[in-house]
């Protein structure tokens, strides 16, 4: 008879490097993201969280900026006030 081992997997929330755009004017968001993305890529970070709040315009600016870099934007299913960005 074969012995089957059961392994308990504990899922931990992996902390993401993040930027909080609260308080940043829409016209300055792209520049803040440019600097943040550059710093994260220099550190070898592959995915970040961008906190946008519930502003649809802020999310659109983030998506437009990410499109310029061909970065993938992933909606956060748990927190609608942020998105994840995969850095290439």
Feature roles, as predicted:
Residues 1-88:
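Long, charged, low-complexity intrinsically disordered regions
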């Amino acid at each position: 008879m074969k012995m089957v081992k059961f392994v308990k997997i504990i899922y931990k929330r992996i902390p993401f490097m993040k930027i909080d755009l609260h308080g940043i004017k829409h016209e300055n968001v792209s520049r803040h993201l440019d600097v943040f993305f550059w710093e994260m890529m220099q550190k070898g970070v592959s995915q970040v969280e961008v906190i946008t709040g519930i502003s649809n315009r802020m999310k659109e600016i983030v998506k437009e900026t990410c499109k310029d870099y061909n970065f993938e934007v992933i909606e956060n299913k748990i927190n609608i006030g942020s998105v994840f960005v995969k850095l290439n």
